[in-house]
Amino acid sequence: MLFPTEFDVIVVGGGHAGTEAALASARMGAKTLLLTHNIETLGQMSCNPSIGGIGKGHLVKEVDALGGAMAAATDESGIQFRILNSSKGPAVRATRAQADRILYKAAIRHRLENQPNLWLFQQAVDDLMVEGDRVVGAVTQIGIRFRARAVVLTAGTFLDGKIHVGLNNYTGGRAGDPAAVSLSSRLKELKLPQGRLKTGTPPRIDGRSIDFSQLTEQPGDLDPVPVFSFLGRAEQHPQQLPCWVTHTNERTHDIIRGGLDRSPMYTGVIEGVGPRYCPSIEDKIHRFASKESHQIFLEPEGLTTNEFYPNGISTSLPFDVQLELVHSMRGLENAHILRPGYAIEYDYFDPRALKASLETKAINGLFFAGQINGTTGYEEAAAQGLLAGLNAGRYVQEKDAWCPRRDQAYLGVLVDDLVTRGVAEPYRMFTSRAEYRLSLREDNADMRLTEIGRELGLVDDTRWDAFSRKRDAVSRETERLKSTWVTPKTLPPEEATALLGKAIDHEYSLAELLRRPGISYDGVCGLKGGECGPAEPLADDPVLLEQIKEQVEIGIKYQGYIERQASEIERNDANENTRLPDGIDYREVRGLSFEVSQKLNEFRPETIGQASRISGVTPAAISLLMVHLKRRGLGRRNGTAEAATEQGDGAVPTQQ
């Protein structure tokens, strides 16, 4: 039957990509339908019970700055919070939280059920409705046809998923859930380039059978307790719990080696490539054969369960080997396994077949987000989901897509890497992937993106008000520190010595003093008995106050580095956003090698910047392209004044 209501956007899948996509589309005013095979698993944390980490936490902050749900849901469900790399520079500091799985799902579902313009429906999708070169809807397993002008597909590991435990395997999207076999077959009919990837998860352990007296406790940060959302408060956090640390040993490694002849990875049963940066314990023992021990973190799954997640022993070994290797580790000698670990193989589609908006090049109105694009991780999925949902909404509103640049957001780095370079293995985000990471910090994600999010219709009044107060206070306080001076006469030598190590010998602005190593904002403001502080409080809210102080201090201390990076961005931007015509035949570009013209015709980059990042495309080839465009008057720059006004300063529109 044809469902009587026609929607603007259909989102298929209710994981981290799908939930953010549905919320973003609905926030923009698009009539949105979220189709999921099981409403009870909306926002399910299928693997580890944690959010954030190096690079990943940056993505979560960016999703939050654009009005997304992941950070706020983590604040409501997080049972341990830590700042990683806290002793290092601000560019690589990252927030990580352990989350209660049940509370996290509840927080996400609450937002979905209370979001205007969003409908939920429980049915697996078996088919897409395609007319010519555009998608027009989706068909469920019982034949209900839902019509829409755009579809966002966020199928996770469900596309033709196959679960492996030892040499046994069966179809499944994850443990306890069916695979999407019919939908996978339908997508293959559409001739979209695809492949197989693999990921895995460890066995789960009953905490009542763990001897914690033999383990090392790892508490969260308490002074201060971190929060994830820019609107978050530590008071929102539920009860906090520690994690625990144990280690593998030589006996563990011998047990694993003895089981490799029954490992699906090492017997060729699994063909998909696994994640390099989240390897199975089999991979670790094989790749790092000289290493005598590996650290294993025992992470609590929640406040109302005894289940623990042993981070570091993801495996697809036979269950008897899993049991033996767990029992070989200190504190786990009598551990009871609640669920076996497993590996899962699934279909993904080459992201080079996508536009930077995450719309497929072959089928208008069809967007992909999450693991279907070859990524791994909740955070990468959520970021893609938000972008795909946003651009699906803009597509039905007949507006240009918004595609963040590499110098603008980690989301921009993520998408640009995917659509220009593709993936040979599951892609995860690291700060090292961003060439402008000093400008792309966690602490300034809102400064970079919230104003754009407001222009796009993603940011509500509450967030906008808090952001505006913070932005204005940072600007005022920075200028005050630059224009407030102390002299040898006005600053007593003993005060100067206590703060700076010696008396000052000439006039300094407070900003110049703050720029010195080891000097803090509070230290500078405390000079002259506190007279160097602001005349009025920067904010009534203590959390907002700390954010303002952090922004001011980082902005002043790293001003020179940030300005140099801004100059570099400006230089590199000269041709970055010059568009390449849709119909160009690169064989006609004089001087291009056969290899380069073949790659350009195959991958169809949208801009000169994307073309330059395709493997094998040389700077000389880019110069020839620029000459060709100028000779024929084909090239045009993205980012007209009209587009910038409509989408927020710094947005890069791309033609649908």
UniProtKB/Swiss-Prot annotation:
Signal sequence region: none
SMART domains: GIDA_assoc_3
Stretch list, region Disordered: 636-656
GO biological process: tRNA methylation; tRNA wobble uridine modification
Family matches, as InterPro entries: FAD/NAD-bd_sf (IPR036188), GIDA_C_N (IPR049312), MnmG (IPR004416), MnmG-rel (IPR002218), MnmG-rel_CS (IPR020595), MnmG_C (IPR026904), MnmG_C_subdom (IPR047001), MnmG_C_subdom_sf (IPR044920)
Cross-referenced Pfam families: GIDA, GIDA_C_1st, SAM_GIDA_C
Highest taxon, organism lineage: Bacteria
Gene Ontology terms: cellular component: cytosol
Residues the entry annotates as binding FAD: 13-18
GO molecular function, a single term: flavin adenine dinucleotide binding
Primary role: NAD-binding protein involved in the addition of a carboxymethylaminomethyl (cmnm) group at the wobble position (U34) of certain tRNAs, forming tRNA-cmnm(5)s(2)U34.
Sequence similarity: Belongs to the MnmG family.
HAMAP family: MnmG_GidA
Name of the molecule in the record: tRNA uridine 5-carboxymethylaminomethyl modification enzyme MnmG
Organism: Burkholderia lata (strain ATCC 17760 / DSM 23089 / LMG 22485 / NCIMB 9086 / R18194 / 383)
Recorded name of the encoding gene: mnmG
